[in-house]
């Protein structure tokens, strides 16, 4: 029997983007779910109310993309979770960095009249 060489292509990894109303957290995992690297808008350098902006989400995504390219994680599946302002900006930051995006999923949970909502904020 022949010994076939394994392909030299980069392994597939998941980029999980969690956007909340206050922050954006991006977590890169392998196929088994083990965390390889992560970043948040706060860890990039945005503090306070600036973490919730779309520019902070884009900067966080660009930092994660640079680290992915450094580790040869080029082929990615993207998973979005949460309701925040930075979804499109984070996707734009990942696309412009040179990653090969294979699939995009949105896993945001939508309640069908589940738990009672928090009361509205009045200013």
What are these regions (language model features)?
Residues 1-123:
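Ribosome-associated RNA-binding proteins
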